[in-house]
Each structure stands twice: as structure tokens, then as C-alpha cells.
Amino acid sequence: FFFKQKTAYEISECDWSSDVCSSDLAECRQVDLAPQKQKLDAEKGAAYQDGVKKLRALIAEGELFQANLSHEMSGKFKGNARELYVSLRDGQPTELSCYWEDQGGRSLISHSPESFLNVNGAEIFSRPIKGTAHREQDAQLDAKAAAQLNANEKEIAELNMIVDMTRNDLGRIATVGQVAVEDVGSVVSYPTLHHREAIIRARWRPQTGLAKLIAATFPPASISGAPKVRALQAIAEIEQRSRGAYCGSLGYWLPSASPHGEFSVLIRTACIAKGTLRLAVGAGIVWDSDPQAEWEETLLKGRYLRDK
């Protein structure tokens, strides 16, 4: 784990409470960001592309099949973090959007579309994402972009690797023979992007417990790589920074004989602290990755916030 154990919510039967009430968010006034717009300074594209080349070299040597490489954009932030969350939520609605803050004034603003784990009693599913295309305003061009993404052999192969990893991770805690790929990959459209997503389902024994479930599956396959341990080592060597909350997970857990919980993958997640906003973005790197194209994909993923 990348965190210290700490109580985030107080849970009693079906009631829950936190320091941030949903009613508070709903009542926030719509923020006008134009006067406070700050340019996010990205790392130089050349440095990121050099990292892509290093990963391709490791792939050529047989050490890796795939790895997720990220970089971080940052800028000064003036305003109210909750208001920014509400403003972005209206333009980027996703089921797993969330706002979190601690007593020290640090905030997470997440508009992640990716489900890491969804648990309902003995049923578990995971919905990894790999493959991205920009949405077009013209309906015909937009449909063409989605079709091209769906037929892109590189993106298909990349998602297939992540599906296999996720299936293997869930197999560590699932009942024998109870892991299945429900959807090997379909294009799902969001307000600004198309993504390719898969669905893997498993049955498990709930008495196994949350700690063992997380230990078997974390970090998510889609933001690490294959094989996972070597990919994480390579990522740390190349990125030379802590990812913090980015690519971690945020969710809730209702313990019982038939537990329920849901955890997102913290992508599309901005971190705000001490007047600075940080947004990390990444792309999956495989042998046939083009460094320039991967760099441009990361910028595309951060566009929803940079254009705000």
C-alpha cells in the first residue's frame, strides 16, 4: 500500500458520514475560472519521449511487455477547490467522480471513468481502460474516430494484455474457475474522449477480506504494466518522482457477511495543496509505441483541465 491506515469515514449500518457533505457540493456556486486561469507547465516533451524509448528498449530485451509512463503538469491555483470540482463535474460527468480533502487543506478532485474494483457480496468486477481518442464535434467524424479506435491493433493488443493481468490478479482470490472476461474490449464515449474498456468478473469468498483482496490486485494493472513488478521498477527508475495519489485508488467499503464496495483508479485526478495544482497524465507503452504520439495522448488526457 502507498498509504497509512486511517479512518476516512464513520460507518454505522447503512449510514455514513464524512467532513464533506454531498449537500455542500450541490450548493456551491458555479465557479468562473476565467479570471484565475493558470497555465499548467508540462515537462518537456523530449524528456517524456526519451522515457518511452527507454521502455521500448526494455521491451526489446524481453524484460517488459507493457508499462504505463506518466508525467506531471503543475501550476498556481487560486480559488475554491470544491467549486472547481463542481464545475468540472458538470462538464465531465462520470460515475466515479469524487471530491476529497483532509484537515490539512489538501484536496483531490477526481473525474475518473475507470473502475478498479466493484464488490457486491460474492461478485467482483473490474473495468480497465486502455486506448484513447479525441471526440469530434461533427457526428460523422466522431463516429469515425470511435471506429478507428475500436479497430486499432496496437490499442487492442494493449488492452488484451491488461485484461490478462487483471484476470490473473482476480484469480488469486477468486473461487477456482470463477473468473471470466465478460467484455474483451468495447469503445465507450465520454464528453471529450473515447476509450476502449473491458469487463472482468469473478466470484470470491467474502470472508477472505478486503486486505487480501487489495493485496492481490493493487496497484491496478492498467496503470502499472506487465509483468507488474518489473514494470513498477522501470516506471520508478524513469519517472524519478512519487506519483502520490495519482494511479492509486479511492473508494468505500461496507463490511458485512455480504460486503459492498467500489474503488476507482485515480486517473483524471488533480491534487491541490498550498496554492499549487498538480495533474499527472500517462499512456501505456508497448513495443510499437510512437514516442511523439504517446506524448500527445497524455496532453489529450489533460486537456479537460487545461482548457478550463
Protein language model annotation of sequence segments:
Residues S12, S18, S23-K308:
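Extended alpha-helical targeting/anchoring segments
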Residues F3-I11, D15:
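Short, exposed "boundary/linker" segments that immediately precede the start
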